[in-house]
């Protein structure tokens, strides 16, 4: 039987040092332990797949670690039980399934017992799924904890759905989206450990597809490896086969043809991609809007190091060679809006692309 583990599980951090980004949040958790200032309740929030539950588990493991300095040791009996998922004092609850008031009341009875190790930590995953009655019962527990060596970690993608009275009793730990560069470096590290190679532009392209979610991108990496088969070198063809999206180099090729209004070059580029299995619907849905957005960012003077160019084009390349104006981009976008509906249900989508180019360059 296969021992395959998805990348997101295989490379899930087991120490604070392994967690990508979230430096301030990690420092708050670490300092609370070093300074012996127990956090009775924290609210960890953010989009899916950025490490909310992972950080909650690490904090729970840390407060019970026998050798904690700046990080967990992963060697003491408490850490070993936590790694095995059998720690008696770390209770993780799926609030989507256990969201009723009766469950919270039953939990309170369990919490009255003293922890076997140092602290008992309760992690409520997706806590916003709890019913109003369950939240009211939880509030009473937060106000009057049944035991002093007790901490609660509320994890959610939607904190506004929690009652204000609960939020007011929590230390907020908001997690931001991860930067594409951070995600790309993580993918590179994983590929090196797994014995794969990939062009940097492919890693950059993948890293921006997940919208800042590391788990989503790691799942895409698994799909990309499967699409590549036994090949150890991942290239742009694998990217198109798996997702129908363009790599950075292909964005550059498309940008050059749009910038110079080269209809032949645009048609040839798309013909090459279609022959490699690209879904033109995705090109319309993501490729063209992405480029138009990046053109607008640079032409408007809004580009800074903090604003990513989703296509992966460098600002200098666009500034030096961009012949378009903001008015041109506006016209391009209006034509794209008019032509895009024609693509759905089209028997020959490449003809719709050619129509788009003709209208684009004639105007």
Positions of PLM-derived features:
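P-loop/Walker A NTP-binding region and its immediately flanking N-terminal helices
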Residues: 1-178, 182, 188-190, 200-201, ...
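Extended, largely alpha-helical regulatory/partner-binding modules appended to the mid-to-C-terminal parts
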Residues: 151, 155, 171, 175-363
């Amino acid at each position: 039987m296969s021992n395959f583990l998805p990348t997101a599980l295989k490379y899930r951090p087991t120490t604070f040092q392994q967690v990508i980004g979230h430096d301030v949040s990690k420092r708050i958790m670490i300092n609370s332990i070093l300074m012996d200032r127990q956090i009775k309740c924290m609210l960890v929030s953010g989009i899916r797949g950025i490490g909310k539950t992972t950080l909650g588990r690490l904090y729970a493991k840390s407060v019970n670690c026998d050798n904690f300095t700046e990080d967990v040791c992963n060697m003491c009996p408490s850490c070993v039980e936590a790694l095995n998922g059998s720690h008696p004092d770390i209770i993780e609850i799926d609030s989507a399934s256990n969201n009723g008031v009766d469950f919270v009341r039953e939990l309170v009875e369990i919490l009255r017992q003293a922890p076997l190790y140092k602290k008992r930590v309760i992690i409520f995953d997706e806590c916003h799924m709890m019913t109003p009655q369950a939240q009211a019962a939880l509030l009473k527990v937060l106000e009057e904890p049944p035991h002093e060596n007790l901490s609660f970690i509320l994890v959610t993608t939607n904190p506004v759905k929690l009652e204000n009275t609960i939020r007011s009793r929590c230390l907020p730990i908001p997690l931001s989206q991860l930067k594409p560069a951070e995600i790309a470096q993580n993918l590179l590290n994983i590929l090196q450990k797994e014995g794969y190679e990939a062009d940097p532009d492919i890693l950059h392209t993948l890293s921006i597809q997940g919208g800042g979610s590391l788990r989503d991108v790691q799942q895409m990496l698994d799909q990309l490896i499967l699409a590549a088969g036994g090949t150890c070198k991942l290239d742009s063809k694998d990217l198109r086969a798996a997702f129908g999206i363009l790599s950075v180099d292909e964005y550059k090729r498309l940008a050059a043809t749009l910038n110079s209004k080269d209809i032949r070059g645009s048609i040839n580029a798309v013909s090459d991609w279609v022959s490699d299995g690209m879904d033109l619907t995705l090109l319309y849905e993501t490729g063209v809007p992405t480029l138009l957005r990046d053109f607008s960012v640079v032409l408007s003077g809004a580009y800074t190091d903090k604003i990513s160019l989703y296509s992966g084009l460098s600002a200098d390349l666009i500034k030096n060679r961009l012949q378009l104006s903001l008015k041109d981009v506006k016209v391009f976008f209006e034509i794209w809006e008019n032509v895009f509906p024609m693509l759905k249900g089209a028997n020959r989508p490449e003809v719709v692309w050619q129509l788009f180019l003709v209208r684009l360059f004639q105007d």
